[in-house]
C-alpha cells in the first residue's frame, strides 16, 4: 500500500469504476425486502451546498448499509426545474450579456434559452453529487420537466379538477411586483421596521355625528395610499363611541366615495382610534371583513405596484361591478406605490383632514427571492382544495403509518395541517408546467391533458378558437408527486410495485409544509394498494437541522460565510476562496468585511481533506433535528482518523502479507488480546447497528471512531507485539488471523460512512481472507453474534489496560523517561489480580516497559514508592535512584508558582464588579471553569511534592 493516504488519487477513479460496474442499481431480487430513498431533488441549475452534502451523506450511509444487508435497494436521483429561481437566473444572464428582457425574446424563445442554460449548467450539481460518493442509480435519473413527469403532472391536475378539488377563483394573493407573480405564504419573509401611523379624518355623511358630537371619524392607517380603494370603515360593535353609527356612511376623502360603516370584531377598541379603513382588494384582513359584510372590492394597483389609470371594481364574489365609479384622481394615476403614499398624505393634509402622524413599529412582508415589499393583490388564480386532501394525511401520522424522527416535528406538522388553507398553485411565470386549461372567446374554461382531448371531450369544432392558460404551476406541485411520478406513474410499473411506499425521506424542517405535507396529501389521494387503501409516500421522515457556521450564523452569500463542501474535499487557495466569496455580490459594500473575516479564518486557504473525512464529520455532527455549527477542527480530526486507519492497515498488511494467516487450516492459538479484540468488535457491531437502525448517525460515528482509534489502533496493535516478536507458530497464526479478520470486518462496518478508503484497503485485505468478490459495497454487513460474547477476555484485558495506564501515568507525573525500565510491585492483590499478572507477565512487561513484576505479601509495606490504586490491587513503583530529589522538587515548585499566578489573575477578574456586570454569562462561566481546572492541577502538584519529599 502507498505510504501515505492520498484521497485525491483514489476517490474519483474508484467512483467511476463503481458506476461503470452498475453496483448502484437495485439487485432486482424480489425475494428480499425492498429499501428505497427518494433524493430531495436539488435545483437543476444550482450547485451543491453544505445542506445538500449533509443530507446526502446521511442518505448514502443508509443506502449502503441496507444494500450490504442484501435488500433490493434503490436510491432514486433527480433534479427540480425550480421555477422562479431558474427563470431569475436566466433573466439576469440575458440582461447582463445582451441587455434584453424575456419579453424581448418572447415565451417560446425564452423557454428554449432556459433549456440551453440547463444543458450547460445542469450537470454541475450531478457532477458534485458523484464527488460525494453518492451511490444513486444514475440510469433512472429524472427531471421534474421531463416527459414522464410532465404527463404525471397533467394527469393529477385533470383528475383533481374533475373531482372538483381544483378550482379557479379571484382571491387575494401575495404578489411580487418585481417578479410579477403570485408567491406562496411560505416564500414571504416578514421583516420588522420603523414606520408611521397616519390618523385621517373621514367626514360623516347625512349630518351624522359621533357620541361626542364630531362630524367625522378618525381612521388610523399605516398604508394611506390604499385609501383610494376603501369600500368601508369598521368599528367594534361593542364600542360605545361608534356603535350607533353602524349602518351609516362616511364620505371618502379625495374620491368622495360614499362608503358604509360596518360593525366587526376586527376593529379593536384599544388600538389606534378604534376605526379601521377597509380595503378588501389590498389587505388580507380587510378581504375577510369585506366578505363578511358583502363589501365591493376595488383594485387600484397594476401588477408592477403602480396606481392604475382607472380602478377595477368587483362585487364581493369577484364579478365586475358598476356599484362604484372606477375613476382615480388624475394626480395619483401611474404613480409608483410609495410615491403615491406621499402624494395621498399631502393631498389629505391640504384638505385639513390629516389629524396626526405617530411613529409605529411595523412588520413588512418581503419576497424572499425578489427582495421587494409584497403587495396583497386581487387576481384570478388556480387553487387546490386542501382540507379534503389533508384529512387522510393527518390520520396517517396519527396512526403511525408515517413516523417523524425526531417525534417533536409531528406537532409542527399537525398544527399546520389542521388549519390548512387552500393552496394557490398558479404562478405568473414562463418556466414550469403550463396549466392544462384552455379558454374560448366567451371565457369558458376547459381542462384536459392536451388541446385535442379538450376539443374531443367538449365537441368543439375547428372553428372554435381556444387559447391555453398563460400561467404555470407552482414548482412544489410537481415536487409533491415525486415519490410516485419518478417510478413511472400513471403507468402501473414494476418499479412502482417494488419500491412504493418508499422507506425513508430525509428533509430539512424548513420544507415540512412546502413539500413533506404536500407529498403525503397527493400520494395518499392517487396511490392505493390492492385493497384500495391509500398508500403513504414513505414510512419515516428523518428531519435534519440547518448547518450554520462556527459562530452559529446561518450560511449566506451576503454574510460571506458559505463553505463549499467540495472546497473541503479538494482544497482551495486563499485568493480563490476570496474571489468566490466576494465576486459578483449583490451587495458589493460588504466585500471588505467578508475579505477580512475570511483571511483571519483561513490564512492559507482550505487544505484538501478528502470526501471520506467530510462525510465522517457530517455523520458525527448529525444529532437528530438539531442545527449544527460547522467545525473545521472536527474535519481535521476525521482526516487524521482516515490517516490512522490507513497506517494501521499498512501495519496489519506488513505483518500478514505473504505469511500464514490460518485461513487454510493449521493450528491456531488465540492470545488474550486476540480474544479481547474479537469480543470488543462483536459488541461494537451490536451498538453500531442499533445506532444506524435508530437514525443516530452521530452515535454510530462515535462508536466507529472509539473502536478504531482507541481499541484497535492504540491498544490491540500494541498488544500484538509480544506475540509478533516471539510467539509460537500457532500463536502467530492466531494473531495474524485475528488482525486480518477484525480489519476486514471493520472495513465493512465503516464502509457506509467512509466508502472510498474502506474499498481501497479492502481490495488488499480480501486476498488474505480468500474472498474473491469484486467490491466491498456488495459484501454482507457485519452481524452481531451472541455466541461470541467473551466476558472473561473483556474483563481481563480491561484490568491489564488499567495497570499499563497507571504505570504510564506515574512516568508522566514523575518526569521519568518513557524508555527507562521500571520495577513494579503489587500489594494487596485479589486472587483475580494475581491470576491476571501471572498469566500475562509478558504483555505487562513489554507494554509498560517493566524490568520486573513482584507480588508483595499482604503485610509487606515495600520501599518508598509512588502508588496507584487499580481494581483489586495497589501498584507501587519504587522511586530510589529514579529521580534527582532536589531538581524534581525545584521543578514542581516552579510549576506551582506558575499556576498560582493564573489562579490569582482569574480571581481578580471575577472580583471585578465591572467585568462581571458587562461580560456575557458564557464568558464568566468559562473563567470559573478555568479556575476549577487550575485548582485541581495545583492540588495534584502538591500531592506529588509530598511523595517526592518523603523519598
Swiss-Prot record:
Catalyzes the attachment of valine to tRNA(Val). As ValRS can inadvertently accommodate and process structurally similar amino acids such as threonine, to avoid such errors, it has a 'posttransfer' editing activity that hydrolyzes mischarged Thr-tRNA(Val) in a tRNA-dependent manner. Its EC number is 6.1.1.9. InterPro entries: aa-tRNA-synth_I_CS, aa-tRNA-synth_Ia, Anticodon_Ia_Val, M/V/L/I-tRNA-synth_anticd-bd, Rossmann-like_a/b/a_fold, tRNA-bd_arm, tRNAsynth_Ia_anticodon-bd, Val-tRNA_synth_C_sf. Keywords: Aminoacyl-tRNA synthetase, ATP-binding, Coiled coil, Cytoplasm, Ligase, Nucleotide-binding, Protein biosynthesis. It comes from the Bacteria. Monomer. PROSITE patterns: AA_TRNA_LIGASE_I. HAMAP family: Val_tRNA_synth_type1. Changing residue 222 to P: Produces mischarged Thr-tRNA(Val) and Cys-tRNA(Val). A motif ('KMSKS' region) lies at residues 554-558. The lineage of its organism: Bacteria, Pseudomonadati, Pseudomonadota, Gammaproteobacteria, Enterobacterales. It is found in: Cytoplasm. This is Valine--tRNA ligase. PANTHER family: VALINE--TRNA LIGASE, CHLOROPLASTIC_MITOCHONDRIAL 2 (PTHR11946:SF93), VALYL-TRNA SYNTHETASES (PTHR11946). GO terms for biological process: cytosolic valyl-tRNA aminoacylation; positive regulation of translational fidelity; valyl-tRNA aminoacylation. It catalyses: tRNA(Val) + L-valine + ATP = L-valyl-tRNA(Val) + AMP + diphosphate. It comes from Escherichia coli (strain K12). The gene is valS. A motif ('HIGH' region) lies at residues 42-52. ATP binds at residue 557. Belongs to the class-I aminoacyl-tRNA synthetase family. ValS type 1 subfamily. Residues 880-944 form a coiled coil.
